[in-house]
């Protein structure tokens, strides 16, 4: 689960992590009022959406007087902001964050995330802040520190010293940053985050460090332990189809291909997507119907994937274990009663009650179903139907 910058910064403040003063605004008048209340002569007017790259997309502006605050707020609020993370469809800006200015002398990058390959928590830091970290990693890898932390040991001084060394900080600056990272690490662990990112982390003329931006992503499976975090969910920022699928116990992620996938189990779903790509076609989604799929949930899955007008073929790949194949077959029939299916369906069913499922489909009146003998054959059929 992702949250907005203003929400992340409120959490930072509660945990003693330095941020600049700021207030959320839901209207132009409120934006101007917030700037007046914050005081000063420079403010940042920031679009609040669940995506990075806001500045390049025109969603972050620096105002040097209240008239500029009003002007920028009126332009950003209600705009459809397109960034490299939103996709071409963009995101509607429904709220702003008005933040006090600062005398910035240097920008850094800092993130804490879980490195699955290394089975460690990893701190990533760079002296090149305010930029695309992937570009920095490609062009100037020597400017990036990657410090692994064993969760059983936790964050220690030597971890912080390595970060300070790569960032080129002096002794006093290093002490300040290490203290800040220690608080961030504790917050990351305490709140079951997947990722905590500050880009940029700024150093002021006074030598102090502040989180100028804040991005936090939380483990959905751990939200039951953090009701105060779950309350921060902004469903307007989520894909409607993905949100609806979750309500029915389906794991759905929309992609940009033309082959819709319906699979049971995340591992098999990823393998299915891989073999579709290998065949030369492109998956339109990730869809795991889970272990408790019923005819009703399968019908709902059909309904959701058929809303994607790019879909040319549906590939159903089920290995019956907990999920019986006959349930999937009945779900297909149920779906076709309520939703008109005019595109080919490739079905590969194996495992529990696979023979019964084949009989159900053979006895149906569905003319556009093609049976696959195995996964490879299914991918080949899909590719031939996509063209």
Swiss-Prot record:
Signal peptide: none
Cofactor note: Binds 1 Mg(2+) ion per subunit.
Enzyme Commission identifier(s): 6.2.1.5
Catalytic activity: succinate + ATP + CoA = succinyl-CoA + ADP + phosphate; GTP + succinate + CoA = succinyl-CoA + GDP + phosphate
Gene3D superfamilies referenced in this protein's UniProt entry, alphabetically: ATP-grasp fold, A domain, ATP-grasp fold, B domain, Succinyl-CoA synthetase domains
A GO molecular-function descriptor: ATP binding
Annotated Mg(2+) binding sites: 199, 213
Recorded metabolic or biological pathway in which this protein acts: Carbohydrate metabolism; tricarboxylic acid cycle; succinate from succinyl-CoA (ligase route): step 1/1
Cofactor requirement: Mg(2+)
Gene Ontology annotations of biological process type: succinyl-CoA metabolic process; tricarboxylic acid cycle
InterPro entries from the UniProt entry: ATP-grasp_succ-CoA_synth-type (IPR013650), ATP_grasp_subdomain_1 (IPR013815), Succ-CoA_synthase_bsu_CS (IPR017866), SUCC_ACL_C (IPR005811), Succ_CoA_ligase-like_bsu (IPR005809), Succinyl-CoA_synth-like (IPR016102)
Binding of ATP, residues: 46, 53-55, 99, 102, 107
Keyword Signal: no
The UniProt record lists the keyword Metal-binding: yes
Any one of the GO CC terms: succinate-CoA ligase complex
Binding site for substrate: 264, 321-323
Pfam family of the protein (one): ATP-grasp_2
Keyword terms of this UniProt record: ATP-binding, Ligase, Magnesium, Metal-binding, Nucleotide-binding, Tricarboxylic acid cycle
Class of this enzyme: ligase
Subunit structure comment from the entry: Heterotetramer of two alpha and two beta subunits.
PANTHER family according to UniProt: SUCCINATE--COA LIGASE [GDP-FORMING] SUBUNIT BETA, MITOCHONDRIAL, SUCCINYL-COA SYNTHETASE BETA CHAIN
Family: Belongs to the succinate/malate CoA ligase beta subunit family.
Name of protein: Succinate--CoA ligase [ADP-forming] subunit beta
Annotated source species: Campylobacter jejuni (strain RM1221)
């Amino acid at each position: 689960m992702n949250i907005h910058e203003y929400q992340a910064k409120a959490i930072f403040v509660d945990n003693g992590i330095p941020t600049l003063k700021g207030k959320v605004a839901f209207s132009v008048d409120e934006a101007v009022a917030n700037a007046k209340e914050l005081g000063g002569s420079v403010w940042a007017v920031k679009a609040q959406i669940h995506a990075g790259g806001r500045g390049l997309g025109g969603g972050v502006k620096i105002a040097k007087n209240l008239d500029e605050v009003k002007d920028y707020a009126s332009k950003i609020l209600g705009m459809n902001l397109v960034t490299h993370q939103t996709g071409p469809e963009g995101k509607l800006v429904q709220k702003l964050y008005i933040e006090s200015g600062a005398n910035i002398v240097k920008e850094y990058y800092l993130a804490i995330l879980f490195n699955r390959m290394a089975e460690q928590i990893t701190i990533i830091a760079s002296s090149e802040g305010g930029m695309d970290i992937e570009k920095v990693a490609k062009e100037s890898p020597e400017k990036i520190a990657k410090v692994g932390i064993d969760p059983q040991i936790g964050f220690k001084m030597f971890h912080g010293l390595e970060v300070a060394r790569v960032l080129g900080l002096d002794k006093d600056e290093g002490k300040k940053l290490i203290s800040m990272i220690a608080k961030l690490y504790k917050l990351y662990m305490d709140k079951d985050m997947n990722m905590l990112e500050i880009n940029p982390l700024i150093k002021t003329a006074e030598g102090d460090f502040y989180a100028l931006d804040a991005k936090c992503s939380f483990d959905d499976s751990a939200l039951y332990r953090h009701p105060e975090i779950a309350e921060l969910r902004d469903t307007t920022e989520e894909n409607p189809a993905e949100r609806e699928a979750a309500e029915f116990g389906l794991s759905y992620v929309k992609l940009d291909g033309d082959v819709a996938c319906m699979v049971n189990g995340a591992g098999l779903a990823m393998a299915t997507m891989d073999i579709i790509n290998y065949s030369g076609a492109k998956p339109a989604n990730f869809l795991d119907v889970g272990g408790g799929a019923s005819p009703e949930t399968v019908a709902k899955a059909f309904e959701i994937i058929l809303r994607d007008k790019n879909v040319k073929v549906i590939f159903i790949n089920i290995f019956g274990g907990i999920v019986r194949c006959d349930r999937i077959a009945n779900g297909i029939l149920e779906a076709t009663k309520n939703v008109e299916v005019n595109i080919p369906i490739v079905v590969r069913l194996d495992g529990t009650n696979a023979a019964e499922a084949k009989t159900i489909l053979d006895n149906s009146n569905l003319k556009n179903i093609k049976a696959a003998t195995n996964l490879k054959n299914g991918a080949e059929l899909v590719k031939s139907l996509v063209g």
